[in-house]
Regions:
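A bilobed periplasmic-binding-protein/Venus flytrap-type ligand-binding module shared by bacterial periplasmic
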Residues: 2-27, 40-41
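Second-shell loop/turn segments in exported
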Residues: 13-17, 24-27, 66-74, 103-107, ...
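Immediate post-signal peptide segment of exported/extracytoplasmic ligand-binding proteins
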Residues: 22, 78-100
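Detector for C-terminal structural segments
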Residues: 31-62, 109-119, 142-254
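Structural transition elements
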Residues: 48-88, 107-110
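Short, well-ordered beta-strand elements
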Residues: 96-106, 129-132
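Short alpha-helix C-terminal cap/hinge motif
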Residues: 117-129
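Short helix-initiation/N-cap motifs at beta->coil->alpha
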Residues: 131-142
């Protein structure tokens, strides 16, 4: 399985009073069986996301993958999901909420992904899901940009091989922060990351930044897009990257 570097996730609109409740967001994340989605539905080499920074993207000064050094922030627990939703509804003073799930029908595999999410979320008592099918362009440049959504089924691909290509999306002023997430602690930490000269200190700060984002669940990571391929066992030296040119054949030998 080869990572394509893309993270597929759910963007909650935190200007929605129901989604501003952390327990509601926790319920949504816990209701998703990521392993089942990847292995039994997508079946394309994708793997369950463990955090907001995908695996294979960036290596630490000590030579370790960011994902291996950071914590795992995702899990599937239907009972805990229901308990979190029950607590959230209690805090909101409601017995039931309805959320719109927006996705692009012209984005593969968004339709399959969205349907899976609909079933997972709707299985929770007290939560109804309304599907909003549209185009990728309308989803991003109209609905997300104007805040006309509750939950958006979306993805992000790395612009460069550093965790900040994902972590900057948590900054309150970031143009891709469509959910209007604001955390002054994260903003200050990301400012340190941008100006830090010591590589090891910067690495630790980025791990801490992801923890803040995942504790707040400003984004709900679901899976890392992959491609299932076959490679001759005798072929050595093929370099595969999730960013930029995917294959380098310069060092291939047999």
């Amino acid at each position: 399985n080869i990572s394509e570097g893309f993270l597929f996730y759910v963007q909650p609109n935190l200007e929605n009073a129901d989604l501003a409740n952390l327990n509601v967001r926790k319920a949504l994340s816990l209701a998703i069986n990521r392993k089942d989605l990847c292995e039994n539905v997508l079946k394309d080499g994708s793997q369950a996301a463990k955090g907001f920074v995908p695996s294979g993207l960036s290596i630490s000064p000590e030579g370790k993958d960011f994902r291996d050094e950071a914590a795992t922030y995702t899990s599937y627990d239907k009972k805990a999901a229901q308990a979190a939703l029950d607590e959230g509804l209690k805090e909101l003073g409601k017995s039931e909420i309805t959320l719109r799930l927006t996705y692009g029908t012209d984005e593969s595999p968004m339709d399959v992904f969205a349907t899976y999410l609909q079933n997972a979320f709707s299985s929770l008592k007290g939560l109804k899901i309304e599907m909003v099918a549209t185009t990728k362009q309308d989803r991003i440049y109209n609905k997300q940009k104007n805040g006309d959504f509750d939950l958006s089924v979306t993805r992000w691909g790395p612009d460069y091989g550093d965790p900040t290509t994902y972590l900057t999306m948590g900054i309150s002023t970031n143009g891709n922060n469509y959910g209007k997430y604001t955390n002054s602690e994260l903003d200050a930490l990301m400012d340190k990351v941008a100006n830090e000269s010591d590589a090891n200190t910067r690495w630790k700060e980025m791990i801490d930044a992801e923890k803040i984002m995942m504790d707040d669940l400003c984004y709900i990571p679901v899976f890392e897009k992959g491609t299932a391929t076959l490679q001759n066992k005798d072929v050595k030296g093929l370099v595969i990257r999730p960013v930029g040119v995917p294959y380098t054949f310069q060092y291939v030998s047999k």
